[in-house]
Amino acid sequence: MSETVHNRIAVLRAERGISRRQLADALGVHYQTIGYLERGEFRPSLHLALRIAAYFEVPVEVVFSIEPFPRIGGAAVENRRSA
């Protein structure tokens, strides 16, 4: 069973002004691993997922989901189109 794991790593990094390299260094992984994770090309181990959540000080379900995350501003755009 090959399920996609969706994540908000790029959003969390951008909100905090953290580069891929800075996050990778803090987690002890190669910076390209962060890019692979963000693009959905690599599924993290449970241990790495928990470490990423701990780094951002949020619950793991804020960072990772098997369901796509709603687009930011998507509802606002739809509401404006309906009006």
Each language-model region and where it sits:
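A short, Lys/Arg-rich alpha-helix, primarily the initiator
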Residues: 1-15
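Short, charged recognition helix plus adjacent turn
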Residues: 54, 64-83
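Alpha-helical residues within the helix-turn-helix
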Residues: 14, 25, 54
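Recognition helix of helix-turn-helix/homeodomain-like DNA-binding domains
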Residues: 29-42
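DNA major-groove recognition helix of helix-turn-helix/homeodomain DNA-binding modules
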Residues: 47-62
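Conserved hydrophobic/aromatic packing and binding residues within compact polymer-binding modules
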Residues: 9, 23-24, 34-37, 63
